[in-house]
Amino acid sequence: MNQPKKERFKTSVGGQALMEGIMMRGPKQMCCAVRKPDGTIETKLDPTPAHGVWTKIPLVRGAIAMIESMIVGYRYMMYSAQVSMGDDYDPEEEETAFEKWVGDHLGKKAEDALLACAAVLGGLLAILLFTVLPTLIVGGVNHFVTLGRWAKVVLEAVLKVGIFLTYMVAISKMKEIHRVFEYHGAEHKTIACYEAGDELTVENVRKYTRFHPRCGTSFLILVVIVSVFLYSVLPWGSIGLRVLFKLLLLPLVMGISYELLKWCGRSDNIATRIIRQPGIWVQHLTVFEPDDSMIEVAIAAVTPVLPEDPEDGRW
């Protein structure tokens, strides 16, 4: 009698590659591990932010998760840059005069608000590059060569995907970013090893794939693809109005993309394999093979955040 196939365990534990380090996020704690110039690994533990009611509402939680990820990621990226340069992390030492004034007069909430603004500003620049620019280019082309509605839709889609891929290729050629993408690979391999039930050692982690279906890169390419389909129904009468509609629909685009990512992470069938395949392809640009020292950092980052009962961290 054939035994039913055992479903592979999938964890909600995940992370982010940093400058010479990795941040791992578990159900209760987050840990940032950074390789210092002297070869040692410095770790920093923080409680995982509490999830409010909004994070449980489908479609809404996608945009919230994206914004939270940007803010937390920016904070840890700054921390890792400081530690990897050889200085002990001291927030007071690295504060500018303006930041110190804000902290002294307005308190920590104002500092957090400034950090959020910095992260959101980065997001707005990305929106300008991947959402607004393709529409403006199509509008410019249409000024010289009259295009039909679907010609505009196709051209905008090609431009959007082209700009996205060109951006990824360009930044992957930068030495510092290339190392971040190698740490990205170490993060994926470590999670895969944990999900397989193997002991977290360098030898065990090394043998696992660097590609992961629930990667942030997969989410980004889903956002691009979903936006192509959703924005195709918007009017082209006014370029300014079209850009406005696209910006208003962006939270919905992120929400749909997030739900698709969660579905693909939980299910394994023909539909989910097709949906997640573009993300795996693009990971060839953002996830590289790590060396053993990077795997050591990933293990140091993930070990403190793993729940005692793996079921508490099930995806």
Predicted feature locations:
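Cytosolic-side membrane-entry/anchor segment at the start of a transmembrane helix
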Residues: 2-13, 17, 99-136, 140-144
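Divalent-cation
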Residues: 1-93
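Membrane interface segments of multi-pass transport proteins and intramembrane proteases
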Residues: 100-109, 138-155, 234-244, 263-273, ...
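Juxtamembrane "helix exit" motif at the C-terminal ends of alpha-helical transmembrane segments
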Residues: 122-147, 223-247, 251-254, 258
